[in-house]
């Protein structure tokens, strides 16, 4: 009969020795509480640390519709890890979620985060969560909860992943879903801060192939600064527009660029005709195209090309909209217009 291994020869095990430090995680929760408190807004009914975050819907809605969104930051995280700079990646996370939610006409209300890592480094985590808090303040949403998962063996020690979750509310009759878009409508683009949080797998490939150090000077700052510039949060600007402009559709320009994202909010048998000479690409996109020898079609399909949000509205409102955006400190351009198409599937046509 086979004997069982003698476990007495080994020291006793614990969760901590297995790689999960519960006390360190508890310390992090305490560090998060003042960050969350700074984001508090009317409607918050609970603090951080409970089993669920409680939020009361604002009064005054006749038929409130909840709008949810979830997203991550993609491989931009790899640059943050390589550079050991984690202070703005949380802003990216919030931006990717709230910018999606507001395209429906909804006001983003609250946010939750998920932070997973192979080894919990509280200093790193505090930087990330401080950024998330800053993003929530910029978006005027409350940070009401989240999850920290230490998973040794699944992630390498320094690696981590982030996911964000946002919920907003919109009056049912004010939902923006593209159904109001008409042929002849104008398209206005609002400037991005750079690649935002998309295209970084290609960016990292370009950097690796060209053997270019991230410390290299670029546009009066380091290349690292340019590539880690946080994603713009458009919530305050768009909420102001909603109060004064009849916006027919909104497209958040993320992975897939203008080519893939604008058609998501267009009705059948229409196309967005965009004049590529309507704005100047930020220098970072010229640089990436040159260093990677990236075909122009691939650039359009991968990057935002300097446009972070696209508005579709009646041509009669263009001047007022541009003036309002300028007053709000935004850089914006007329990108083109909506035209009819013989194809049922909406599309984008970029004119040279």
UniProtKB/Swiss-Prot annotation:
Its main location: cytoplasm. It catalyses: 2-formamido-N(1)-(5-O-phospho-beta-D-ribosyl)acetamidine + ATP = 5-amino-1-(5-phospho-beta-D-ribosyl)imidazole + ADP + phosphate + H(+). Disulfide bonds: none annotated. One of its GO terms (cellular component) is cytosol. GO terms for molecular function: ATP binding; phosphoribosylamine-glycine ligase activity; phosphoribosylformylglycinamidine cyclo-ligase activity. Belongs to the AIR synthase family. Keywords: ATP-binding, Cytoplasm, Ligase, Nucleotide-binding, Purine biosynthesis. InterPro entries: PurM-like_C_dom, PurM-like_C_sf, PurM-like_N, PurM-like_N_sf, PurM_cligase. Its EC number is 6.3.3.1. The gene is purM. The lineage of its organism: Bacteria, Pseudomonadati, Pseudomonadota, Gammaproteobacteria, Legionellales. Pathway: Purine metabolism; IMP biosynthesis via de novo pathway; 5-amino-1-(5-phospho-D-ribosyl)imidazole from N(2)-formyl-N(1)-(5-phospho-D-ribosyl)glycinamide: step 2/2. Transmembrane segments: none annotated. This is Phosphoribosylformylglycinamidine cyclo-ligase.
């Amino acid at each position: 009969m086979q004997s069982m291994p003698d476990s007495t020869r080994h020291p006793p095990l614990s969760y901590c020795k297995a790689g999960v430090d519960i006390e360190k995680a508890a310390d992090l929760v305490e560090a998060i509480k003042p960050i969350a408190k700074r984001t508090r807004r009317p409607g918050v009914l609970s603090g951080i640390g409970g089993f669920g975050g409680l939020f009361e819907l604002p009064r005054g809605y006749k038929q409130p519709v909840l709008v949810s969104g979830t997203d991550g930051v993609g491989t931009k995280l790899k640059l943050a890890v390589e550079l050991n700079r984690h202070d703005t990646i949380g802003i990216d996370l919030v931006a990717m979620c709230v910018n999606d939610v507001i395209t429906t006409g909804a006001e983003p209300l609250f946010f939750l985060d998920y932070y997973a890592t192979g080894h919990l480094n509280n200093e790193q985590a505090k930087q990330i969560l401080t950024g998330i808090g800053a993003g929530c303040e910029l978006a005027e949403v409350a940070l009401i909860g989240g999850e920290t998962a230490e998973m040794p063996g699944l992630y390498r020690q320094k690696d981590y992943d982030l996911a964000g979750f946002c919920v907003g509310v919109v009056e049912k009759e004010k939902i923006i879903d593209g159904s109001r878009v008409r042929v002849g409508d104008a398209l206005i683009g609002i400037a991005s801060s750079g690649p935002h949080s998309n295209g970084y797998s290609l960016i990292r490939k370009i950097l690796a192939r060209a053997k270019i150090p991230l410390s290299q000077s670029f546009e009066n700052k380091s290349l690292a600064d340019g590539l880690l510039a946080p994603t713009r949060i458009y919530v305050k600007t768009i909420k102001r527009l909603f109060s004064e402009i009849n916006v027919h559709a909104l497209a958040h320009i993320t992975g897939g660029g203008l080519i893939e994202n604008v058609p998501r909010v267009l009705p059948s048998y229409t196309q967005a005709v965009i004049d590529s000479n309507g704005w100047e690409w930020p220098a970072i996109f010229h640089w990436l195209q040159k260093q990677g020898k990236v075909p122009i079609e691939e650039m359009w399909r991968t990057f935002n090309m300097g446009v972070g949000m696209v508005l579709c509205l009646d041509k009669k409102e263009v001047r007022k909209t541009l003036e309002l955006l300028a007053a709000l400190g935004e850089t914006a351009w007329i990108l083109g217009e909506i035209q009819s198409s013989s194809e049922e599937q909406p599309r984008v046509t970029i004119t040279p």
